[in-house]
């Protein structure tokens, strides 16, 4: 979302006077006379009635009025501006319809970008900004990812408690439209907890697991097990379910669902979607150890009919987690490469062996090139002597 700088030609006193007159004309309970207590008191009273303009008026006109209020707010010293900014942000969440909601969103974005990047007030503005963006279905205009979020607050990082509150909000506003982004947010949230307070993050940890399991684009779930709040769930059904998605095959999930059907459904998880993901994860695990698989093997392991194998493999290839070739004539699948579901000590050892083999091969090639180069040089010298 773009935002233009705030420039108002009138002086502060003139702006305050005009705003008071405007809102009084709209029927607001406010004096048209400027306060003798200073501009902060004027702003408090103006902001207190500013939502009266939501009842009538064109969005463009209201945008101009709010722009004027913002232009005054950003002149208030930091130590006296917090209550004013919070009051304004709260008013902006009260827009009665979508067009005015977008006006309020633009106004908050303008305020956010015109505050000093080192101002702690930017956090409060951004929090309300996300709330309004949700109302307007414009969340991705103000939040595109965790890295972008952190860069916004690089000069004044919020406290851990503030970030936890913000991450929870971001999870809530993205969970219905972008599960992948929502899952990343929850992982960041759990990462803010330490060993000392991870035990109080039970609800957040459960939400994180459920979001990751429900996301059709999240397949590598092993990192969740390392998060401290998730460790505190060991022994709980949700942790058992996560462990199945991390390292078990389809039959383990089927058995879990038969034993705990009500629990799975109570978490808002879709059984058919779970089956689809577990089939893919099972295929990945089979591909790690079997460079060649028959259709018959896949029908048994994945619990599908033989005529479903080809469409299934094609869907797997679309994820780019596995590279393979279908051999329809011989009813086989030839695996070229696959992502690992988990990456522990065995995978590190395999990677070490692979790199060592590459190193040895490169050394052999280098020695061969050196020999060829020396032979060519000797040949050139001998030909020169002959002539």
Curated annotation (Swiss-Prot):
| Location of the PCI domain | 181-340
Record's keyword annotation contains Cytoplasm: yes
| Record keywords | Cytoplasm, Golgi apparatus, Initiation factor, Protein biosynthesis
Q: What is its main location?
A: cytoplasm
What PROSITE patterns does the record point to? PCI
Positions of disulphide bridges: none
Gene Ontology molecular function terms on file: caspase binding; cysteine-type endopeptidase activator activity; translation initiation factor activity
Q: Work out whether the entry's keyword set contains Protein biosynthesis.
A: yes
Enumerate the InterPro entries for this protein. COPS7/eIF3m, eIF3m, eIF3m_C_helix, PCI_dom, WH_DNA-bd_sf
A GO cellular component term found in this entry reads: cytosol
Where in the cell is the protein located?
A: Cytoplasm; Golgi apparatus
Which biological processes are named by the entry's GO terms?
A: formation of cytoplasmic translation initiation complex; Golgi organization; protein secretion; sperm individualization
Record-linked SMART domains = PINT (SM00088)
User: How is the quaternary structure described?
Assistant: Component of the eukaryotic translation initiation factor 3 (eIF-3) complex. The eIF-3 complex interacts with pix.
The entry sums up its family as follows: Belongs to the eIF-3 subunit M family.
- Outline what the protein does: Component of the eukaryotic translation initiation factor 3 (eIF-3) complex, which is involved in protein synthesis of a specialized repertoire of mRNAs and, together with other initiation factors, stimulates binding of mRNA and methionyl-tRNAi to the 40S ribosome. The eIF-3 complex specifically targets and initiates translation of a subset of mRNAs involved in cell proliferation.
User: What is the name attached to this protein's record?
Assistant: Eukaryotic translation initiation factor 3 subunit M
Q: Which gene encodes it?
A: Tango7
């Amino acid at each position: 979302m773009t935002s233009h700088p705030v420039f108002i030609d009138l002086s502060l006193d003139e702006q305050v006077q005009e705003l008071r007159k405007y809102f009084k004309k709209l029927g607001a309970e406010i004096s048209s006379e400027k306060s003798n207590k200073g501009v902060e008191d004027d702003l408090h009273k103006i902001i207190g009635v500013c939502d009266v303009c939501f009842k009538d008026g064109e969005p463009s006109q209201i945008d101009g009025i709010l722009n004027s209020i913002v232009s005054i707010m950003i002149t208030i010293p930091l130590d006296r501006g917090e209550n004013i900014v919070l009051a304004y942000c709260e008013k902006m969440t009260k827009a009665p319809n979508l067009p005015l909601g977008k006006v309020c969103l633009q106004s908050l974005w303008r305020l956010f970008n015109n505050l000093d990047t080192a101002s702690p007030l930017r956090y409060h503005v951004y929090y309300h900004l996300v709330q309004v963006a949700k109302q307007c279905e414009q969340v991705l205009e103000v939040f595109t990812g965790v890295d972008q979020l952190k860069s916004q607050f690089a000069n004044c990082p919020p406290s851990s408690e503030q970030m936890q509150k913000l991450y929870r909000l971001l999870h809530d506003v993205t969970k219905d439209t972008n599960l992948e982004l929502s899952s990343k947010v929850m992982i960041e949230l759990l990462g803010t907890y330490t060993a000392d307070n991870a035990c109080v993050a039970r609800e957040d940890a459960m939400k994180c697991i459920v979001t990751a399991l429900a996301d059709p684009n999240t397949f590598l779930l092993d990192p969740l097990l390392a998060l401290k709040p998730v460790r505190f769930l060991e022994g709980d059904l949700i942790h058992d379910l996560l462990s199945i998605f991390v390292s078990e095959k389809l039959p383990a999930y089927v058995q879990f669902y038969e034993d705990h059907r009500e629990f799975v459904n109570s978490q808002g998880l879709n059984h058919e979607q779970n089956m689809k993901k577990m089939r893919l994860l099972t295929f990945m695990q089979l591909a790690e150890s079997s460079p060649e698989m028959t259709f018959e093997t896949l029908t048994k392991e994945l619990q599908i009919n033989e005529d479903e194998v080809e469409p299934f493999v094609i869907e797997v290839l679309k994820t780019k987690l596995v590279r393979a070739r279908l051999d329809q004539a011989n009813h086989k699948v030839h695996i070229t490469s696959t992502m690992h579901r988990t990456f522990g000590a065995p995978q590190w050892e395999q990677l070490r062996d692979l790199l060592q083999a590459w190193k040895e091969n490169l050394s052999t090639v280098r020695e061969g090139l050196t020999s060829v180069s020396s032979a060519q040089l000797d040949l050139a010298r001998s030909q020169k002597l002959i002539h």
